Amino acid sequence: MVRVKRGNVAAKRRKKILKLAKGFKGAHSRLFRTANGQVMKALVYSYVGRKRRKRDFKRLWICRVNAASRSHGLNYSKLRNLMKQASLNINLKMLAQLVLFDKKAFSQIIDLVNK
């Protein structure tokens, strides 16, 4: 039976991990074992971060809409309920954009909903 040397495959695998660890401090970017652990941890953090980003933006949009609607005498919950009753379907992101960039349009929405 011919002996299989894995030098090529192992070197490629290590090189790939060390390339991913570029920018890490100290041994975390130079030594394979520590770099491997840190890369795995970083990949987990990035996966979790992508899920978390969605939650964070939703919270931010709700805060913005709530603050703007309170200045008109409504809170966020009542505003969304009144919008639903008026069959006004504007998603949360667009509503937050209106609050930031077009306060006049947001005021018109409030007036339309309050009728």
From Swiss-Prot:
It holds the Pfam family Ribosomal_L20. Disulfide bonds: none annotated. It is found in: Plastid, Chloroplast. GO terms for biological process: ribosomal large subunit assembly; translation. PANTHER family: 39S RIBOSOMAL PROTEIN L20. Belongs to the bacterial ribosomal protein bL20 family. This is Large ribosomal subunit protein bL20c. It comes from Emiliania huxleyi (Coccolithophore). The lineage of its organism: Eukaryota, Haptista, Haptophyta, Prymnesiophyceae, Isochrysidales.
